[in-house]
Each structure stands twice: as structure tokens, then as C-alpha cells.
Amino acid sequence: MPSPTFRLYNTLTHETEPVEPIEEEHLRFYSCGPTVYMYAHIGNFRSFLTADLIRRTAEAIGWDVTNVSNITDVGHLTQDDLVDPGGEDKMQRALEREGERFANIYDLARHYTEAFLEDWGALNLREPEVRPRATEHVTDQLEAVIELVEKEHAYTTDQGVYFSVESVEDYGHLSGNTEAQQLQATERDVVEDPDKRDPRDFALWKHDPQHLMHWHSPWGWGYPGWHIECSVMGMQYLGDRFDLHTGGEDLIFPHHECEIAQNQSLAGHQVVNYWVHTRFLQVEGEKMSKSKGNFYTVRDLIAPGPDDDHVPDSVREQGGVDPLALRYALMQGQYRKPFNFTLDTLHTAARHVRRYQDAAERVDAALAADADGPDELGGRLRPIYDRTLEAMCDDLNTPAATAAALDGVKAIEQTDRLNGATARSARNWLDRTNALLGVVEPEHEADQRTDAGSENGLAPAHLSDSIDTLLEDREAARADGEYARADAIRDTLEALGIEVMDTPDGTEWERREQVG
């Protein structure tokens, strides 16, 4: 049968729409990734799972996919949820909280990035084509900020550089927030810059020479704002027109609203066509909270430690649940509806995943035996897969998709004798279902594309340009006798895994190790 039409809910238009890629049958999208200051919780991963399912569904209908998913390792302020120009960087606050565990802020970022990637793999999420890190694109971000100032979409104060919300039309369109609602949000700001022109204006660059992660800029030492990071990384790899952008509903305002303002000011036109957001997750009917004891990271549930007393006994006593069971449980609510995560849901998911695994073991044993006989399952399993794919194309209706797919497991279970032909049909169905839903068996991809275009430990081209720019700044500082600034630039490069060598013929560098 022909592939069904892939439809998703577009936050920008408030409509469920057919997804029509700019390039025919090639979906190009950006996914907001984690801020690596703590272990990611199951609500975070529900959003990342949505992006993974978009990818799998697009591939199932024959499309090519290019996905960019970032790592935020600088610039996400504690008050960025409120468009606060002040507040404290989440990375810096994390180091204050856990300073004894880490030598410096880069070690902290490396630790939580590695943990995030481990959790990502455990939940069977496919790797994006590019996973850029904000700290590797600071030069690019500076260039964007300079351009916004030149175009009079931004202005400077003693505290930094701000985007002028008044300079763009339709700010608030994505979220539906009126100007009054935007102003109400800013009333909760912790730190305010008296030189801001409009309370709604947000930071593009923060002037702070004392910040633990800082770079030289035309406005002095400081660091980039969170919103400009994603705008720059998205357009760096996907161009100034791409199909889709994903994230959690908490990012609609202000983060994605700010991204749209920046993107359109830089490009001069709409950059992203579809905005897809995952709704919040509750645990046992309540907001997830450490104070309530219902705050779960992924590793709390798949590999709890002996001191993780907040983890339910039914999970801790068995050493954690199968990661695929957690993935399956998170799929029991459609992404754009609030989801109540319960232990009952988790344990039911574990039983269903075990049935898939038992069926796969039985099928593989039958394949090895390869007994003669007619195919008794192909005709039953093909329409089951079609129904599963139709549900996924219907705005990622994962509850309907997993229910349909379970009928395929039942069909295998109810087949008394699996001959070779029947087993081949069953294995084909299992493989196709796993490619679509990712709940049958772990996938082990050979090309783990965890860094932005890196291959064999070599720095990607865009990073090489940034490094050369930093080295030029360092040489200028040394020539001017500003040795402290030159040393700070060298420290920044070394923390990024770049070894700087001063030779009689000039300064050279090489990539020593990957960050994170």
C-alpha cells in the first residue's frame, strides 16, 4: 500500500498539518538538546523521544533525514525561563553545588554529557547527524550578535547585548502570549539591567569577565545567551530554511519565541516551517519534584544505586527496569497530551517488551532450524505493520501504534509451529516494527555521530575556523602585552581539547581529545 501522509501538530499554526519537506522526501530538523548540568530526567527524555519517533516515522515512509541536536554547555541562565537577562548560569551553579567532584566547569560538562549520551543510547534513540556543542560555536554566535547589532535588532549596555523585541513583528505569535503576558513574566526577574529599553528584551551576550566560561568579544569578556546559541547552531548546519524544530512545551516561551525573532532578523524571512512541542509529564498524578520523592532520572529507573531510596522498591530490588521498557512506557501517552507516568504503566511496559523479546528469541530459533512449510504469518503481519505505521503518521499516535503492534506479537505467540518461511516473515515484521518504534531490541549503530562532524578525532571545519580566530586573538593579546588575556584564551582552547604549541615558525595547534 502507498505510504500514509505524515501529519504533525504545528504549534506555529495551531493545526495538525501534513509535513511537506522543503526538499522532497528529505526531512531536515533541529532538536533542542540538554543543558548538561545534571542527569537528564524522564520528562527531558520524553521530549527527546518525540524527536526520535519523528525521525523513525519519516524514515519508515522512505524519507531521508538530517537531524541536528545540540548540547548546551554554557549560557543557560537559571532565570532564562522568564527571559531574565540576569540570573546565574546553570553550569556555573552546578559547579558550585558539586565542586568537590570536578576539577573545573569543563570537567562537569564532560561528565554530564557522557552520562546523557549513555542514557540516550540505553533508550534506543538514534543518533543525530550532527550534535554540536555551544562552546564550539562561540565565534559563530559572536558574529550573529554583531550582525544583529548592525541591523539595529540589538543594542549594548554595560551589562551586555540585548535583542530589541520591539524591532520585530509578531513576537509572541508562537506562544500566543500578549505583550501584557510577556511583561508579567519579566516582573519575576531576579536581576534587572536598568539600561534595558524594554523589559521583554533578552540577552544575546552577557558581559562577565569573572564567569568561569568566558570569551573575548567586542564588548569585553563574557559569554553568549542561550537563545542565540540554538539559532546559530540550527542555521549553521541546516541553512536559513529548514523544515522542523522540536522541544518541550516549556521551551515555547521564551526560548523558541526568541529563536524565531533572532532567526528572522538574521535571515530576513521565516526559517522554520513546523514547530513541534512535547507536553509535560507528571508522575503518579503530581508534578515531578525532588521534594515529593517522585523525581526520576533515566538512570534512577534503569540502574538505581544502593542509596537511591526515592526509587520505588519494585524497581530498585530488581536492579532497575529494561531501558526498552522505560521507552515503551513513555510511548503510552501521545507527545502533545499531558502524560501521567505511573509504576503500573512502567511494569506493564516491561511485560510487553518481554513478550517482544520472547517472540524474537523463538523466531530466531526457528530461523536456525529452518523447517519446511508454508508461510503462515506474512499475510497477518503485513496489515498489522500498516496499521502501526498509520498510527505513527497520525501525529505520532504512539498509544495506538503500540497497541496495533502488540497484535503482531500475539499472532506470533498463537502460531504453534514456526517453520522457516513463517519465521522469516515474523523476523521481517519484528525488524520493521523495531525500526519504527524502537521497542523490540536495542540498536547498535556503527557510526556514533556524537560530535559536530568530527571524524577520527579531527576537529570539524567550522571548529577549525573558530580555533584560528581564537589564536589570532591570543597573538594580538601577546603583542599588546596582555598576557593574562592570552593565557585565558589558551586555557579555553585547552579545556576544549586543543593543544596550543608556540614554535619558532608561529603558533600551531592540534586536537588532543574530544570534549565530553
Swiss-Prot record:
Catalytic reaction equation(s): tRNA(Cys) + L-cysteine + ATP = L-cysteinyl-tRNA(Cys) + AMP + diphosphate
Binding site for Zn(2+): 32, 230, 255, 259
Amino-acid positions noted as binding ATP in the UniProt annotation, renumbered to this chain: 290
Motif window: 'KMSKS' region: 287-291
Entries under Gene3D superfamilies matching the protein: Cysteine-tRNA ligase, C-terminal anti-codon recognition domain, HUPs
Alphabetic keyword roster: Aminoacyl-tRNA synthetase, ATP-binding, Cytoplasm, Ligase, Metal-binding, Nucleotide-binding, Protein biosynthesis, Zinc
Cofactor: Zn(2+)
InterPro entries listed in its UniProt record: Cys-tRNA-ligase, Cys-tRNA-synt_Ia_DALR, Cys-tRNA/MSH_ligase, CysS_C, Rossmann-like_a/b/a_fold, tRNA-synt_1_cat_dom, tRNAsynth_Ia_anticodon-bd
Disulfide bonds: none
GO CC terms: cytosol
Renumbered ranges of motif 'HIGH' region: 34-44
Subunit comment: Monomer.
Entries under HAMAP family matching the protein: Cys_tRNA_synth (MF_00041)
PANTHER family: CYSTEINE--TRNA LIGASE, CYTOPLASMIC (PTHR10890:SF3), CYSTEINYL-TRNA SYNTHETASE (PTHR10890)
Designated name of the protein: Cysteine--tRNA ligase
